[in-house]
Amino acid sequence: MNFDMSKLMQQAQKMQEQMKKAQQERENMEVIGESGAGLVTVTMTGKYDVKSVSIDNSLMSEDKEILEDLIAAAVNNAVKKVEENSTASSDIYKMAKDAGIDLPSGINFPFK
């Protein structure tokens, strides 16, 4: 079996570029999580930063605990959407395969 170091380096560089692109796409992502049929919305970035919280005026007369629960649910919904829309971790396996590298399944990458 011939081992071509230059080909391996080219494949690794290609995979690194693809991973960088996937990370940038995630960083630029924005999602809106909601609860209470849209009465509470949370805008979150792909880096899990909450940019805004919107609470419908009709909830201002509600019990404090109800409002807290709705806010928590909206944040959790936004987190779920970031994870669902993030291509980074699933694309790593595809990128590695395209580069001729077999990764074992179940690896937890640090940016997932």
Swiss-Prot record:
Compositionally biased residues, Basic and acidic residues: 17-27
Region (Disordered): 1-27
SUPFAM superfamilies: YbaB-like
Main location, first listed in the record: cytoplasm
GO cellular component assignments: bacterial nucleoid; cytosol
Compartments it resides in: Cytoplasm, Nucleoid
Superkingdom, natural source: Bacteria
Signal peptide region: none
Subunit details: Homodimer.
Similarity field: Belongs to the YbaB/EbfC family.
Function according to Swiss-Prot or TrEMBL: Binds to DNA and alters its conformation. May be involved in regulation of gene expression, nucleoid organization and DNA protection.
Name the record gives this protein: Nucleoid-associated protein FTW_0607
